[in-house]
């Protein structure tokens, strides 16, 4: 009889403990935060990366536009002036500094014949922080068909950047991430073709 009573008391005690345990809400907020915090942090960093990438892409377009505008305002130009303009263009990307842009300035003349050809007259390039010769003189340049007017002269400026996010991956991580690893570098580029404003063409004596 006593054994049965004691067993019943223990069962009730256990049942009460379980009910209290199930009904206890202490620490729920901490557990929920621990579960949702990684998701919130991921969303924050993704949003930050997307915003920075969009802003940097706009700046690349601004670089090409500004450089083309400055060059086409000249009646003639020299290598030192071209290099200075490209260096000014590079500073537009500040404070982004995780990779360096490539800026190409190419003077193009469309031949005046039955089959017009876009021919490079001179070309300069800024790459890896240094300047040098771009496309070979006399080579064929790629321009839109709408601009292939016989006897015309164009300045083509292209800006390129391999955008690197704040969070980047190692080679081993890229291979394991698969498609996600492709976001380690985002290629951005913009090209502008403008005509000279002050003269028919813009010669460069020492390019």
What are these regions (language model features)?
Residues 24-39, 49:
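N-terminal signal-anchor/signal peptide hydrophobic helix marking the start
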Residues 40, 57, 168-170:
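Short, function-defining helix-loop hinge/capping sites that tune catalysis or transport
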Residues 1-26:
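N-terminal leader/signal peptides at the extreme start of proteins
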Residues 28, 43-75:
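Aliphatic-rich helix starts adjacent to a transmembrane/signal segment
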Residues 16, 24, 41, 150-152:
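Alpha-helical hydrophobic/aromatic positions enriched in membrane-embedded helices and signal peptides
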Residues 2-4, 65-207:
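Short, conserved structural patches
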């Amino acid at each position: 009889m006593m054994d049965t009573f004691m067993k019943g008391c223990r069962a009730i005690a256990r049942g009460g403990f379980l009910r209290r345990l199930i009904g206890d809400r202490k620490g729920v907020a901490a557990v929920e935060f621990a579960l949702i915090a990684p998701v919130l942090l991921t969303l924050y960093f993704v949003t930050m990366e997307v915003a920075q990438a969009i802003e940097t892409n706009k700046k690349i377009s601004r670089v090409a536009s500004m450089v083309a505008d400055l060059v086409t305002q000249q009646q003639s130009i020299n290598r030192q002036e071209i290099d200075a303009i490209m260096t000014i263009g590079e500073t537009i990307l500040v404070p982004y500094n995780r990779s360096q842009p490539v800026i190409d300035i190419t003077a193009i003349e469309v031949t005046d014949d039955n089959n017009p050809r876009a021919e490079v007259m001179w070309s300069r390039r800024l790459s890896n922080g240094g300047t040098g010769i771009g496309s070979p003189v006399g080579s064929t340049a790629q321009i839109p068909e709408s601009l292939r007017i016989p006897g015309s002269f164009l300045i083509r400026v292209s800006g390129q950047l391999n955008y690197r996010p704040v969070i980047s991956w190692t080679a081993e991580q890229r291979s394991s991430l698969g498609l996600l690893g492709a976001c380690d570098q985002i290629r951005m580029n913009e090209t502008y073709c403008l005509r000279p404003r002050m003269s028919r063409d813009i010669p460069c004596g020492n390019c």
